[in-house]
Amino acid sequence: MFELSTIYAAFERYFGKPPTRIARAPGRVNLIGEHTDYNDGFVFPMALDRATYVAARPRDDRIVRVFSVKFRDEDQFDLDHIVRDTQRQWVNYIRGVAKGLLARDLPLRGADLLIDSDVPSGSGLSSSAALEVAVGYTFQLLNQINLLGEELALLAQGAEHSFVGVKCGIMDQLIAALGEAGHALLIDCRDLSYRPIPIPTGVRVVVCDSGVRHRLAGSEYNQRRAGCEEAVRILRPALGKIQALRDVRSTDLAEYGHLLPPELLPLVRHVVSENERTLAAADALAAGDVVKMGQLMVESHQSLRDDYCVSIAELDTLVDLALAAPGCYGSRMTGGGFGGSTVSLVEAEKVDEFVAAMIAGYAIRTGRTLQPLVCTAGAGVSCVYASEEE
C-alpha cells in the first residue's frame, strides 16, 4: 500500500516546503481488446489499485521543477519555452502535458512537482499514461482548471504523440481518467463512450510481469499502426466510406481480404477479430460467464501471437503456465507486447495455488523470479490530499 505520508515527507525534504496538493492516477490492465484502440475499436480495461502520485506546490513564476523518486532524477523547464529533452524520455511526458495545456490557452503558473509510483515501468500496465494523467490533473488543481475526464485523456494522449513519439491509442489515458472501482470499462475508442461492467466477486485478476522490458517508441509499434492505416486505404474503395479497421467485419474480410498484401492481412485479421472478441467478452462478464470470458482471452492471445506478432517467448510461457495452473479461466498477454505482462482470470478460492504454481513454473522454465500481482479494480484520477494553503 502506497503511503501518502511518504511522498509528503519526500516533497518537503526536497523542496523545503510542504505540498499543497497530492494527486494520483492509476495504472491499468487490459482484460481484452489489444491494438484495437488506435483503430477506433473497442477495449475492455480496468484501472488498478496501483498508481502514480504527484505531490505539488504552486510557484509565483513560470518555472516548473520536477523530481522523480523512481528515477532519482530531476528536471526544470520554463513554461514559456518548452522543448523536448533528447536524452531523458521520462521528462517529456511532463513537458508534453504542460505544452498541451498551454496550447489550449489555459492559464498555468510554475510549480514544484515530486513524482512517485508503485506502477511497474515497462510491464504493460501503462505507467506512462498514469504519469501523464496525474500530471495533467495536478496542473488542473493548481490552476483552477476544469477539464472533463475525456478532455484530460485526450490531452495526455496528445502529449505522448507529440513529445514522446508514440502514436498510442486513447485507452490507457481514458481508463486512468475515468476508471471505476470494482469495474472494468468497455470503451468505444471512436466516440469515447463507455460502459462499466462489475468484476464478479468470485474471480481475481492476476498480472504476471515477464521481466522483459519493451520500448514502444521503437519502430515495431508504429509500423503496425501504419500498416493498419494502409489497410484501410486499400479496402476503402471496396467497402465504401470506412474510417478505420473498426468498420471492417469478418464477413468483409472474407470477401475482400485478397486485396490486401500478405504482410497486412494478418494485422487486419487480428484487429477485426479482436473487436468482435472484446464485445463478446464484455457481454460474457456482464452475465457472469467467466468460462466464456476466459476462452475469449485465450483466443486473443493466440491472435496477438500468430497474426499481430507482438508476443515473445516469455509471454507465451506465462500463458501456457497459467492455463495449466489451478483455477485459471483464461490468460493472455496484455499491453503493447514485445515484453511486459500477462493477465489471467482466476477463481478466487484458488488464487493462492495459482500464484504459487506460476512462481515455481516460471523459475523452472526461464530462471526468472516472478512476482504475480493479484489486482483490484481501482478508481480513476483523483486528488488525495489538499491543504488549506493556496
From Swiss-Prot:
Mg(2+) binds at residues 128, 160. Keywords: ATP-binding, Carbohydrate metabolism, Cytoplasm, Galactose metabolism, Kinase, Magnesium, Metal-binding, Nucleotide-binding, Transferase. This is Galactokinase. GO terms for biological process: galactose metabolic process. It is an enzyme of class 2 (transferase). The gene is galK. Its EC number is 2.7.1.6. Coiled coil: none annotated. Substrate binds at residues 34-37, 221. Catalyzes the transfer of the gamma-phosphate of ATP to D-galactose to form alpha-D-galactose-1-phosphate (Gal-1-P). GO terms for cellular component: cytosol. It catalyses: alpha-D-galactose + ATP = alpha-D-galactose 1-phosphate + ADP + H(+). It comes from Chloroflexus aggregans (strain MD-66 / DSM 9485). GO terms for molecular function: ATP binding; galactokinase activity; magnesium ion binding. Pathway: Carbohydrate metabolism; galactose metabolism.
